[in-house]
């Protein structure tokens, strides 16, 4: 069984007020924070690195941390980097809860999955729009999550690509218990497409951080996903 998860992308936040912005979206109903790490090599943009994650972890403790009364969240680190193997340990040390690497960035994805899991966090694999979904079929049984990009990775604020939804549908059909994430252009207008295809983890940047009513946007997207999962008999009974 899977559950609906909304993961606001901090790439769309006001970095001058990152702690406050993250607390706001968590208080509005977000369980995860999606942290886009770009190195200027695998993708043309450069965003943030381990020091930011380390500092943000102090501001946003892990779920289950009973020593802090601050809003808590799961850190979903989307690693748009060359040679992702080199970055596993440092991101684990600095607070990552999940390490999502790109299939296109590694020569041995299964060994990388094993490395990530050996460090005690979740392993996920992402594919670019031009990458066929079937490359994930052999790897998926070892993954905690698969990510189907619905924009070209590298920059926020791009237009949603609905033609990526057959990839999501194919993954959901073959792996009904797998967390399946979509990333790029998600908001109120596009969430029905993602939910219907079978995605349960929704990355949303501008549509959440720039919303006048963040709780309304998050609830709307979560409800769409929840209704579809329930209709398929896949909804986590705890929801």
From Swiss-Prot:
Transmembrane residue ranges: none
Listed pathway(s): Carbohydrate degradation; pentose phosphate pathway; D-xylulose 5-phosphate from D-ribulose 5-phosphate (non-oxidative stage): step 1/1
Key words, A-Z: Carbohydrate metabolism, Cobalt, Iron, Isomerase, Manganese, Metal-binding, Zinc
* GO annotation terms (biological process): carbohydrate metabolic process; pentose-phosphate shunt, non-oxidative branch
PROSITE patterns reported in the protein's UniProt record: RIBUL_P_3_EPIMER_1, RIBUL_P_3_EPIMER_2
Single GO MF descriptor: D-ribulose-phosphate 3-epimerase activity
User: Catalytic activity, per the record?
Assistant: D-ribulose 5-phosphate = D-xylulose 5-phosphate
Give the GO cellular component terms, alphabetically. Answer: cytosol
| Active site residues according to the UniProt entry | 36, 183
Which sites bind a divalent metal cation?
Answer: 34, 36, 78, 183
Cofactor(s) recorded in Swiss-Prot or TrEMBL: Co(2+); Fe(2+); Mn(2+); Zn(2+)
Q: What Pfam families is this protein classified in?
A: Ribul_P_3_epim
Q: Which residues participate in substrate binding?
A: 9, 78, 154-157, 183-185, 205-207
Q: Which InterPro entries match?
A: Aldolase_TIM, Ribul_P_3_epim, Ribul_P_3_epim-like, RibuloseP-bd_barrel
Its EC number is 5.1.3.1
What does the cofactor field's note say?
Binds 1 divalent metal cation per subunit. Active with Co(2+), Fe(2+), Mn(2+) and Zn(2+).
Q: Which NCBIfam families match?
A: PRK05581.1-4 (NF004076), rpe (TIGR01163)
As for what it does, the entry says: Catalyzes the reversible epimerization of D-ribulose 5-phosphate to D-xylulose 5-phosphate.
Would you identify the family this protein belongs to, as annotated? Belongs to the ribulose-phosphate 3-epimerase family.
Give the protein's recorded name.
Ribulose-phosphate 3-epimerase
Source species of the chain: Eremothecium gossypii (strain ATCC 10895 / CBS 109.51 / FGSC 9923 / NRRL Y-1056)
């Amino acid at each position: 069984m899977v559950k609906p998860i909304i993961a606001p992308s901090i790439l769309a936040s006001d970095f001058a007020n990152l702690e406050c912005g993250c607390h706001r979206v968590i208080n509005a109903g977000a369980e995860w924070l999606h942290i886009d790490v770009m190195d200027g090599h695998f993708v043309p943009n450069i965003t943030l690195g381990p020091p930011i994650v380390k500092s943000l972890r102090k501001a946003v403790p892990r779920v289950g941390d009973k020593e802090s009364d601050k809003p808590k969240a799961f850190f979903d680190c989307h690693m748009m980097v060359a040679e992702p193997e080199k970055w596993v340990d440092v991101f684990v040390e600095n607070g990552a809860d999940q390490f999502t690497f790109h299939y296109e960035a590694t020569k041995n994805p299964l060994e990388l999955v094993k490395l990530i899991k050996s460090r005690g966090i979740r392993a996920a694999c992402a594919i670019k729009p031009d990458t066929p979904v079937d490359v994930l079929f052999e790897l998926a049984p070892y993954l905690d999550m698969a990510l189907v990009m619905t924009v070209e990775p590298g920059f926020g604020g791009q237009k949603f690509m609905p033609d990526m939804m057959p990839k999501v549908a194919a993954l959901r059909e073959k792996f009904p218990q797998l967390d399946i994430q979509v990333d790029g252009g998600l908001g109120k207008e596009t969430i029905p497409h993602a939910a219907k295809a079978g995605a349960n983890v929704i990355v949303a940047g501008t549509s959440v951080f720039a919303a006048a009513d963040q709780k309304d946007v998050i609830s709307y997207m979560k409800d769409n996903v929840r209704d579809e999962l329930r209709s398929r008999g896949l909804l986590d009974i705890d929801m």
